[in-house]
């Protein structure tokens, strides 16, 4: 891994932390604070998607740039974020405090490296995610989808359903 501080660029890379949210009032302030600490040079965007709680207000108070997506659904939010935001590195995370921010610099460094990756995928499954997630059949479904995709595409992705991804500008804008 290339440390973020050693990435060679002609200017400071623009990093955007993108957080799609729907009713994340209870966790969004901590998510914004954690990613602000991990990536102090980043701009943090919270896209509120039809929340009925105070997600937007809490995110704004925590220092995030808040935008809204009126069409309900994560797909609409992600498309709007990718269209609206200009950056060299896009870090997609969820607003429910699922992903540890301490790994964000390493993910971004791979996208901003001299020989960059187009996308780096985070991995929840190597941690305590399955023991904490109590939804019935959720783990089995994730394992089945992961096995099928890895089998079909001859890949070795550990967490195919993760929302923790760093992406290059080239990947996002093409």
Language-model segments: which ranges?
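Short, Lys/Arg-enriched N-terminal segments with co-localized hydrophobic residues
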Residues: 1-8
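Cell-envelope/extracellular polymer assembly enzymes that use nucleotide-activated donors
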Residues: 14-16, 43
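Short, well-formed alpha-helical segments that are part of the catalytic scaffolds
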Residues: 23-37
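Donor nucleotide-sugar binding loop of glycosyltransferases
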Residues: 24-27, 51, 74
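A conserved acidic beta->alpha catalytic loop
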Residues: 48-56
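Acceptor/aglycone-binding surface of glycosyltransferases and processive sugar-polymer synthases
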Residues: 70-84, 101-174
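Short aromatic/hydrophobic "clamp" motif used to bind/position activated sugar donors
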Residues: 90
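The conserved acidic donor/metal-binding loop of glycosyltransferases
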Residues: 94-99
């Amino acid at each position: 891994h290339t440390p973020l501080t050693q990435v060679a660029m002609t200017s400071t890379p623009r990093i955007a932390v993108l957080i799609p949210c729907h009713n994340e009032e209870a966790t969004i302030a901590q998510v914004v604070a954690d990613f602000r600490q991990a990536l102090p040079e980043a701009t943090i965007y919270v896209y509120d998607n039809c929340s009925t709680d105070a997600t937007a207000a809490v995110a704004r108070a925590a220092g995030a740039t808040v935008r809204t997506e009126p069409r309900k659904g994560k797909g609409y939010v992600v498309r709007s974020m990718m269209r609206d935001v200009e950056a060299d590195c896009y870090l997609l995370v969820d607003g429910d405090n699922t992903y540890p921010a301490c790994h964000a610099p390493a993910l971004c460094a791979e996208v901003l490296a001299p020989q960059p990756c187009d996308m780096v995928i985070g991995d929840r499954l190597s941690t305590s995610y399955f023991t904490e997630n109590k939804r019935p059949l959720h783990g089995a479904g994730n394992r089945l989808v992961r096995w099928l995709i890895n089998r079909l595409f001859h890949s070795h992705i550990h967490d195919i359903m993760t929302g923790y991804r760093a992406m290059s500008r080239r990947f996002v804008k093409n």
